Amino acid sequence: APGVGRPAVTVGVHAMPGAARRMTRATLAPMTGKIEAYDHLPETARAIREQVFIRERDWRPEFDEWDAVAVHLLAFDGNRTVATCRFYADPDHSDQPGRYVIARLAVLPDAQGRGIGSQLLADAERRIAHSGGTIAAVHSENDHYKFYERRGYQLTDELYDDGRHGWLIKALI
């Protein structure tokens, strides 16, 4: 099972007055829930995106016309919704039939670092392939390129905002 036997991860070093330094350790538990798909934007997905994209990153506008046509995925840890993303057929690349866009991947801060984003991305890729899709594309900020590259995505030459944003693609077949 994912995460079984995962070593503890150091999360901080604290200097205690009059005492030796002590390491604080925590084990990052794997997600213990499920991923569900919706044909509309659920309120819990909206709330996660508001927190991650609007409050933390100040993206505006966050919600757009693609929310109405996308498949929305929610990841649950137990009964709590902790992550979301959406995907839809890419209408802007008719030269690449079977290309889908995976977008708005967001994991709540207290659930990050547990592989939930990776699981959600893999689930979206499986669903796209099952629907006949052959290419997954993500539009990302450059500080997240490595996340996608570690999962098989390649940066394209479609860069924006002086390279701060770009498209990454992955063949699904």
Name what the model sees in each region:
Residues 23-80:
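Short amphipathic alpha-helix that is part of the acyltransferase structural core
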Residues 74, 80-90, 99-106:
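Conserved beta-strand in the GNAT
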Residues 90-102, 112, 162-165:
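A conserved beta-turn-beta hairpin within the catalytic core of GNAT-like acetyltransferases
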Residues 113-126:
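Conserved acetyl-CoA-binding loop-helix of GNAT-fold acetyltransferases
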Residues 128-141:
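Conserved GNAT acetyl-CoA-binding A-motif
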Residues 141-142, 161-173:
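C-terminal "cap" of GNAT-fold acetyltransferases
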Residues 149-159:
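Conserved acetyl-CoA-binding loop of GNAT-fold acetyltransferases
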